[in-house]
Each structure stands twice: as C-alpha cells, then as structure tokens.
Design a protein with these regions (language model features):
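Short, Lys/Arg-enriched N-terminal segments with co-localized hydrophobic residues
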Residues: 14, 19-33
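Active-site-adjacent beta-strand/loop module that shapes the phosphate/pyrophosphate-binding cleft
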Residues: 52-61, 143-162
Length: 218
C-alpha cells in the first residue's frame, strides 16, 4: 500500500533534514500507522573486537522472520573546515573494498563516550587537530538493513594544531582539498565512501543555506 507524503512547500516550511515540520508534525507522522515489531528471540553468534552479531527472531504483525544483526557502539565522523574553505580528508586502505579510499576522518565511539567527545578525540588522534567549535550537523544510520551502527556528523572549525596519535594499525595520509573540488570528486565517482559523501554534501548544503549560496570564511 502506497502512502503519499504531503508536499513540503504546501504543508509547511522546508527544513533540510530527515524529518521536517508539517503543521506541527513530521512527514513520517503522515504515513499509515504500523505496529511496532517485537523481538521474540535473540542469539549472539559472534563477538569481535569492535562489534557483535546476533540472529534475531522478529514478529511483525502476523509475520515471523529472522534477521542477522550487527551490533555496533556507533561512530563520529568529522569534516574539518579551514578558513580558506578547504577540508581535511584521510586516504587509507580499506581491506573489504580492496583499495585505498578518500574519507572524512571518523572512528568508533569508546565505552560510554558521547559522540561530541568521540569526534574531538578522533580529530586529534587521526589528524593532529583540535577544534574550537564542533557543530552537530546530522545523525544517521549507516546500513540499517543489517547493522545498528549510527553515525554523528560534526563540522569542525576554529582549528589549531595538536599531536597526531595513530593506532599501530592505522596507516593514513592526510589530504587537504577545497570543498568545491571534493564535491566534484563525488560527482566524478572518485570519492566512493558513503559517509564521506553524506558528510561533504551536508556540509556544503549547510554553508550555502547560511550564506545565500556562498561558502563563508570560518
């Protein structure tokens, strides 16, 4: 059954985000009500250094089915933005992709660590930078079809140098590039990492909306 969402321009003011106000409600509130699924059984089948995997038995209405679920503590991803509108990205080898990828700096949250603290820590550890300002731009699920990992995206400005502190298995190259060039690399297919594409596009959209289409000095 298809449910038609209301037109943004008619039903309410536009807001660049997953949920947007529509007469005091969100767009998702207009979709037909669906019963909350219930987990009736869950078995852990793998425990790793970063994540665990369970097989969950789920009841949704009259249907009962199983899903493999990756349990992950969540991550912070950062776009470090300099006054000349360049951003700092990292080039690193990703074995599942069997190639080097250009990515926004990011990392898994440590035990009981807030996303903002995690973002500040990763920025300093990976790039050797400290941010005078960390602004939360968005939060999103990475791959909700099988993984519960959530990412928090921060825009880092008012940057100053600190000391890089990489883990033994972290071999990265820091790449400084203009935001406009990074956006062109997305269009050309040269940036292939989903979180980085999301982060750069949301950063560009945020800056343009605040400055009448022009990238600001920060």
């Amino acid at each position: 059954m298809l449910s038609q969402l209301p037109d943004r321009t008619i039903a309410g003011s536009y807001y660049s985000g997953v949920n947007f106000p529509v007469g005091g409600a969100t767009a998702l509130d207009w979709i037909i009500h669906m019963d909350e699924p219930k987990i009736i059984d869950s078995k852990t089948v793998f425990r790793g250094r970063v994540f665990t995997v369970s097989v969950d038995t789920v009841q949704e209405g009259d249907a009962i089915y199983q899903r493999d679920v990756v349990h992950h503590p969540g991550s912070a991803v950062i776009i470090p933005l300099f006054p000349d509108n360049t951003v700092a990205l990292v080039k690193q080898y990703r074995h599942p992709a069997v190639r080097y990828l250009l990515e926004a700096p990011a990392g898994t949250l440590e035990d009981r660590e807030s996303p903002e603290i995690g973002a500040a820590r990763e920025l300093e550890e990976e790039l050797g930078l400290r941010a005078g300002r960390l602004e939360l731009l968005s939060e999103f699920f990475v791959s909700p079809g099988f993984c519960e990992e959530k990412m928090w995206l921060y825009l880092a400005t008012q940057l100053s140098e600190s000391k890089q502190n990489l883990d033994d298995d972290e071999i990265i190259q820091v790449v400084k590039i203009s935001l406009e060039d990074a956006l062109e690399m997305i269009s050309d297919g040269e940036i292939e990492d989903a979180k980085t594409i999301i982060a750069l596009l949301l950063t560009a959209n945020c800056l343009k909306s605040r400055n009448s289409g022009e990238y600001p000095a920060v």
